[in-house]
């Protein structure tokens, strides 16, 4: 379902109040009209990346929320041009979804890391880390955590994975984008 384009008919516009649930909607919320199977367990969709009330919205599914206490799932939909990662989505739906009561799958992931090297006897040596989940080797990197910027993430990840404190080279920043198994769209920034 991640990455699909859907049409949402808004039933609860942003800033509306549901007296029955005692809930003020920070996002537009509605039912999915098209883009998914008619027998899908989708119970509704939150719309991110739109800062005004809308009646109908067509966008891309960027997250799937599955509540632990009940059947069905909720989608998070955004304009194609917008990218939101897990902590941004969790913050946006916090008005309706209590932390720890759901599982979330996201379309987008963002990681940061660094090319760590040192020169010994005129020879440049690079630090590579073996990924535990695969046979791949790479530079130390990891997901951006809530409240971090890219450089803070890179610094923390190198320290956690290698126990090394690093200095950044001025004006070096490389960004790579790729797809993981055709399901997750990942962006990696390396310093």
PLM region descriptions:
Residues 159, 163-191:
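Active-site segment of metal-dependent pyrophosphate-handling enzymes
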Residues 148-153:
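N-terminal phosphate-binding loop and adjacent alpha-helix
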Residues 105-139:
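N-terminal strand-loop-strand
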Residues 140, 154, 158:
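Hydrophobic alpha-helical positions that pack around
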Residues 134, 145, 163:
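A contiguous binding-surface segment within folded domains or other stable secondary-structure elements
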